[in-house]
Amino acid sequence: MRPIREAIQKKRAAGPSMGLRLLLYRFIMVLLLMAAILSTLMATGVLSHPAHQLSGTLDIQQRNTYAALDSQMDALTAQSMAMSEKLGKELDAFLAAKGIAFDELNNDPDTIAELEKRLYTPLSNTLGAASCSGIFFGLNVTANTSLPNAEDFRAGLYLRYSGLQPTVASEQNVICFRGAAKTARSLQLQMHNRWNPELNAALIPGSDQVTAYQGARLADGCLWTKRTELLDTWEQVMLLCVPILDGGGTVRGFAV
C-alpha cells in the first residue's frame, strides 16, 4: 500500500508543474501566431499603406509650401524693383526742380524733409500692396555730416505697421519708424516710440553690398538677406535690398 500512496502523492505534486508548462506552451503558440500574422500583413503591404499615404501627403504639402514661398518672394522682388524705379525718377525730378545736385542734400534737413515727403507716395503705395510688415528707403546723404559716424547715417523714410497681425493693409495703422520729424508731422504720421530721424546703414544687412552695385540691370543688384533681428523691435525679418538708381545709373541709395 505504501508504494501506491507514494506514487499518488508524486503525481499530485507534478500536476501543477505540468499545468504551468501547458499554459506557457499555449502562450508561446499565440505569440508565434500573432507574429506570423503581422509578418504576413507587412509583407503584403497592408500595414505600410497608411505610412506611405502619410509620407506622400507630407511631400505634397512641402512642395506646395515651397512653391507658395517662391511665388511670394518673386512678387515682393518685382514690387520692390518697381518701387525703386519710381523712387529714382522722383528723386531726379525733385533735384531738377530744385536746381541742385544730389550731394547738396547733405546738411540740408529742410530739403531732405521735403524730398522724403515727395517720396512717401510710392513708398506707401508699395507697402499697401505688398505682403510685408514694413518698407523703407535710405539715401546716401545725411542731415548732419559733423556727427560721429555720420558716414553710416542715411536720410530716409521707414514706414511699418503698428501691429503685425495677418490682416489686410486697410485695417492696420501705418507709423513712422525712421524719417525726419518734419516729414512725419506734415504727413500726419504717428511716430514710433523708438523713432530716429535717420537710418544707420551699418545695422542694415546687405546695404553696403547693394549701394556698391555697378551693374546695368536692377534685378542683378537685388539681395535677400538671412533672417535677422530688427533693431529696436522684437521682430525677426528677412530683408530684400534693392539699389536706387538715378537717371545716369548711379546708385543713390537703397530700398528695403
What are these regions (language model features)?
Residues 69, 124-126, 228-233:
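Residues embedded in well-ordered secondary-structure elements
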Residues 16, 20-112:
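Juxtamembrane extracytoplasmic/periplasmic/luminal helical "stalk" adjacent to the first N-terminal
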Residues 1-20:
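Non-catalytic regulatory/interaction regions at protein termini and inter-domain linkers
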Residues 77-211:
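Extracytoplasmic/periplasmic sensory segments of membrane signal-transduction proteins
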Residues 179-255:
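Extracytoplasmic/periplasmic ligand-binding sensor regions of membrane-associated signaling proteins
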Residues 136, 255-256:
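Structural recognition of the beta-strand scaffold that forms the well-ordered cores
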Residues 8, 25-28, 66, 120, ...:
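Sequence-level detector for tyrosine residue identity
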